[in-house]
């Protein structure tokens, strides 16, 4: 499934509208999507009313230095893992003061996959505190662009569902 530009725009607009109605702010912590979620959210005029910031933490060093992800989590579980995306959410919340954060770390390809984490494996987390954080793993098919597009769409939809439950 290829998430089109229009689908991404519509999902970003729906989340933006929901954040405005809920009077909530958001921050992003992205690895394999390279800031694409933040880009989609800020494409909309008025997004400064709900987007506080975005951090692209592609390397493990950036995850540690900017988000406070522990070396232990990275060593024991790898960057593409539930503990790491949970720590990325906590770090983004702490760094920005946002009400909600979303984190993404995955293997977009074409290389970099392993038996345990093949290309297309992407971990997501979103939440407003460590206790409320939800983590989900998805396995997407397609080339690098398709994996990243599907990841952005899934993240936008997942966060909207989270906000709807608040």
Model-derived segments and their meaning:
Residues 1-166:
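Short alpha-helical segments enriched in small residues
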């Amino acid at each position: 499934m290829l998430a089109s530009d229009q689908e991404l725009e519509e999902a970003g607009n729906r989340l933006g509208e929901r954040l405005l109605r809920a009077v909530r702010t958001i921050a992003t912590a992205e690895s394999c999507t390279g800031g694409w979620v933040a880009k989609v959210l800020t494409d909309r005029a008025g997004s400064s009313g709900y987007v506080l910031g975005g951090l692209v933490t592609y390397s493990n060093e950036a995850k540690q230095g900017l988000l406070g992800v522990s070396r232990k989590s990275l060593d024991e579980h790898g960057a593409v893992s539930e503990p790491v995306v949970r720590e990325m959410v906590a770090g983004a919340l702490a760094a920005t003061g946002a009400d909600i954060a979303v984190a993404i770390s995955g293997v977009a390809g074409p290389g970099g996959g392993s038996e345990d984490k093949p290309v297309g494996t992407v971990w997501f987390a979103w939440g407003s505190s460590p206790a409320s954080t939800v983590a989900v793993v998805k396995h997407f098919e397609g080339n690098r662009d398709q994996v990243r597009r599907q990841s952005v769409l899934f993240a936008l939809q997942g966060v909207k569902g989270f906000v709807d439950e608040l």
